[in-house]
């Protein structure tokens, strides 16, 4: 089976099948999750110096920071699956 890759922005790709959540970075629990991932060495920053707008959480415990909106990333996942209904 081919691995589905998701464009997380600026030429960076993430294994779409490994993602369990795409969330906004604004809440305290998500900020704490990002901080804990940084301490564990499981934080991947693909923002290229831009403001973090989405946090992707993988099933491996890795936390990925992206400069794209969560809606944009979710839309890319749906488009890659061929599901354009959004539901």
Swiss-Prot record:
InterPro entries: RemA-like. It comes from the Bacteria. Disulfide bonds: none annotated. Transmembrane segments: none annotated. Belongs to the RemA family. This is Putative regulatory protein Synpcc7942_1027. It comes from Synechococcus elongatus (strain ATCC 33912 / PCC 7942 / FACHB-805) (Anacystis nidulans R2).
């Amino acid at each position: 089976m081919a691995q589905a890759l998701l464009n997380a922005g600026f030429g960076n790709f993430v294994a779409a099948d490994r993602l369990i959540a795409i969330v906004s970075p604004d809440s305290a629990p998500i900020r704490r999750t990002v901080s804990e991932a940084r301490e564990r060495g499981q934080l991947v920053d693909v923002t290229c110096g831009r403001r973090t707008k989405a946090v992707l959480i993988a099933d491996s415990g890795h936390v990925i920071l992206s400069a794209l909106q969560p809606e944009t990333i979710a839309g890319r996942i749906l488009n890659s699956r061929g599901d354009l209904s959004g539901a």
